């Protein structure tokens, strides 16, 4: 499935189906939270949280694609991510975009 951050697809006719979403919320275990807290004292990248964010984005994208597939979409345009903290150790990620179906295929 084609997924793009572009607002439009050029050179192809399509119809808009609906807005689609993929959502997930993740947290790390207490051991990784303690490690992150210690890293916060000395500075630098907190790899446990970077990995958590990457995994959450992948899951959100997979869910986005699945929702688009379920409504018969051929592509998703104007795809975006949004994320936010629910608490100190929980992160929510949303992938969203516009599901479209190609005409004359």
Curated annotation (Swiss-Prot):
SUPFAM superfamilies: YbjQ-like
Paired cysteines (S-S): none
Superkingdom field: Bacteria
One Pfam family hit: YbjQ_1
Family matches, as InterPro entries: UPF0145_dom_sf (IPR035439), UPF0145_YbjQ-like (IPR002765)
UniProt keyword list: Plasmid
Keyword Amino-acid biosynthesis appears in the UniProt entry: no
PANTHER family recorded: UPF0145 PROTEIN SCO3412, UPF0145 PROTEIN YBJQ
UniProt record similarity statement: Belongs to the UPF0145 family.
Name of the protein this chain belongs to: UPF0145 protein
The species this protein was found in: Enterococcus faecalis
């Amino acid at each position: 499935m084609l997924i793009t951050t572009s607002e439009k697809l050029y050179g192809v006719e399509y119809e808009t189906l609906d807005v689609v979403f993929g959502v997930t919320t993740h947290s790390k275990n207490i051991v990784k939270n303690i490690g992150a807290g210690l890293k916060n004292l000395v500075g630098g990248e907190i790899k446990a949280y970077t990995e958590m964010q990457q995994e959450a984005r992948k899951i959100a994208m997979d869910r986005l694609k699945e929702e688009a597939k379920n409504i018969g979409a051929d592509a998703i345009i104007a795809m975006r991510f949004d994320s936010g903290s629910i608490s100190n150790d929980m992160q929510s990620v949303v992938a969203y975009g516009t599901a479209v179906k190609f005409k004359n295929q």
